[in-house]
C-alpha cells in the first residue's frame, strides 16, 4: 500500500485491483455514448452488456436483472422507494442507506443479542396486516460481519405475500452469494467493497417485478435509472466481479486463517478483550472487538500513528466516530460498544500485515496498562 500503510479496513473500501485499473484505463481512452447508434456508441453499449453479464454471474443472477447505479446507497434507495409497498419492515442492523430510505412510518425488526435478526418477531409483524409489504434484511453486517438467515427470512416474507430486499454489499466478494438460493426479490451490490471502483453499484431486480425510477432522465438502464452510463466504472465493476468470483474459494480460506491469527493474538496480548459475533457465522474477513475502558477513537488513532488503518464501527458517517448502533441494538453495554473497533481484511492482506497489527496492539496495550497502573 502507498506510504507503507498496513490497510485493514476493507469493509470501508477495498484497494483497487491492478487489473481493474488497467481495464478502466483502457476504456477511458475510448469515447462513445451507449445510447448513440454510431460505431463508438455501439462499442460502448457492447461493453455495458458484457459487464452486466459479469456482474450478474458473481451472484448467480441473470444479466437482464441488473440495474447499474452510482453505488450501494442509490441501489438501496431505488429498492425501498421504487417498489410499491404500503408497508416497509427493515432490520435494526441495516446500513443507514436502508434505514433512512425507508418511509418514516416503517417498522423495525428487532435483533437478538446474538446479532441475528429475530425471525419470530418478523413473522409476527408480517402477520399483523395483509397490506403489501417490503422487507429488507442484509446478508452480512458491515460492523460485526455476522451473517443473517436471509433464505429463512425470504421464506417467511413470501409466505405472507411480502417481497424481500437483501443488501449484500458487505458479503459479495467475501463469501458465496447465490441470488436464487437466498430467495430475495431485490439485491444490492457495490463494486468498491471487493476491489472495484467507488461510485458504481447495482440493484438486482427479479424479472417481472416493477421498480419505479428515482432518477428521471433519458431512460437508461431500461427506464430504471436516467443518465449517461459511466462505462469506465461499469467496466471496473465487471472486472472486479470476475476476479472476486475466481479468487473466492481460496480467498475465504486465507482470510479465515488470517482473521483467526489476529483474534488469537489479540486475546493473547489483551485477554480481557471482548469479541462480538465470534460464536456466529461471520464473514471470513471481519473481526469486531472491544478493549474495555479504552475508547474506540483512542485505539484507532494510536493504530493510525503506527501506520495501521482500521475503523471504529462503520465508515459511512462523514468521518464521525460514534458508538456503534449495531452493537447497541444487540444489547451491548454503552461503554463497551464505545470501545469497539473493526478490523477487516481483503484481497491484498498478507500474514505480515497481521503481525504488524499485533506488534502495534501490544505497544498500545502496554501504554494503556501503564496509564492505568499510574
Tell me what each language-model feature is:
Residues 1-374:
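Pyridoxal 5′-phosphate
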Amino acid at each position: 500500500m502507498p506510504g507503507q500503510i498496513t490497510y485493514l479496513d476493507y469493509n470501508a473500501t477495498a484497494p483497487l485491483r491492478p487489473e481493474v485499473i488497467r481495464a478502466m484505463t483502457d476504456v477511458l481512452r475510448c469515447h462513445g455514448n451507449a445510447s448513440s447508434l454510431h460505431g463508438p456508441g455501439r462499442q460502448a453499449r457492447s461493453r455495458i452488456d458484457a459487464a452486466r453479464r459479469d456482474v450478474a454471474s458473481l451472484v448467480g443472477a441473470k444479466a437482464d436483472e441488473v440495474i447499474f447505479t452510482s453505488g450501494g446507497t442509490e441501489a438501496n434507495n431505488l429498492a425501498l422507494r421504487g417498489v410499491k409497498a404500503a408497508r416497509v419492515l427493515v432490520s435494526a442492523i441495516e446500513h443507514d442507506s436502508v434505514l433512512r430510505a425507508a418511509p418514516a412510518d416503517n417498522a423495525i425488526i428487532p435483533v437478538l443479542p446474538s446479532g441475528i435478526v429475530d425471525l419470530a418477531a418478523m413473522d409476527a409483524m408480517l402477520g399483523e396486516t395483509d397490506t403489501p409489504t417490503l422487507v429488507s434484511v442484509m446478508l452480512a453486517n458491515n460492523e460485526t460481519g455476522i451473517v443473517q438467515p436471509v433464505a429463512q427470512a425470504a421464506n417467511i416474507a413470501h409466505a405472507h405475500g411480502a417481497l424481500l430486499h437483501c443488501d449484500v454489499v458487505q458479503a459479495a466478494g467475501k463469501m458465496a452469494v447465490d441470488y436464487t438460493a437466498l430467495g430475495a426479490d431485490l439485491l444490492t451490490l457495490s463494486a468498491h467493497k471487493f476491489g472495484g471502483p467507488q461510485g458504481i453499484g447495482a440493484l438486482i431486480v427479479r424479472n417481472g417485478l416493477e421498480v419505479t425510477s428515482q432518477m428521471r432522465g433519458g431512460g437508461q438502464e431500461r427506464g430504471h435509472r436516467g443518465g449517461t452510463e459511466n462505462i469506465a466504472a461499469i467496466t471496473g465493476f465487471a472486472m472486479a466481479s470476475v476476479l472476486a468470483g475466481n479468487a473466492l474459494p481460496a480467498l475465504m480460506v486465507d482470510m479465515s486463517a488470517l482473521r483467526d491469527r489476529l483474534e488469537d493474538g489479540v486475546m493473547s496480548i489483551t485477554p480481557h478483550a471482548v469479541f462480538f459475533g465470534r460464536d456466529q457465522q461471520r464473514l471470513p474477513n471481519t473481526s469486531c472487538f472491544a478493549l474495555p475502558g479504552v475508547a474506540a477513537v483512542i485505539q484507532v488513532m494510536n493504530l493510525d500513528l503506527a501506520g495501521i488503518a482500521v475503523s471504529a464501527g462503520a465508515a459511512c458517517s462523514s468521518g464521525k466516530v460514534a458508538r456503534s448502533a449495531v452493537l447497541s441494538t444487540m444489547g451491548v453495554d454503552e461503554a463497551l460498544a464505545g470501545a469497539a473497533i473493526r478490523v477487516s481484511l481483503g484481497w491484498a492482506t498478507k500474514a505480515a500485515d497481521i503481525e504488524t497489527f499485533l506488534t502495534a496492539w501490544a505497544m498500545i496495550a502496554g501504554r494503556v496498562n501503564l496509564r492505568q497502573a499510574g
